[in-house]
């Protein structure tokens, strides 16, 4: 899982 994707998920969730 890519770090930038994790950041986006954190913002969405």
From Swiss-Prot:
- A GO BP term, please? defense response to bacterium
- Keyword entries, A-Z: Amidation, Amphibian defense peptide, Antibiotic, Antimicrobial, Secreted
Any one cellular component term from GO for this entry?
Answer: extracellular region
Q: Which domain of life is it from?
A: Eukaryota
Question: Subcellular localization, per the record?
Answer: Secreted
Q: Which residue ranges run through the membrane?
A: none
Where expressed (tissues)? Answer: Expressed by the skin glands.
Q: Which positions does the record annotate as the modified residue Leucine amide?
A: 13
Function per UniProt: Antibacterial activity against Gram-positive bacterium S.aureus (MIC=80 uM).
Similarity comment: Belongs to the frog skin active peptide (FSAP) family. Temporin subfamily.
Q: What is this protein called?
A: Temporin-1Cd
Source organism (scientific name): Lithobates clamitans (Green frog)
């Amino acid at each position: 899982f890519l770090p930038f994707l994790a950041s986006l998920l954190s913002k969405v969730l």
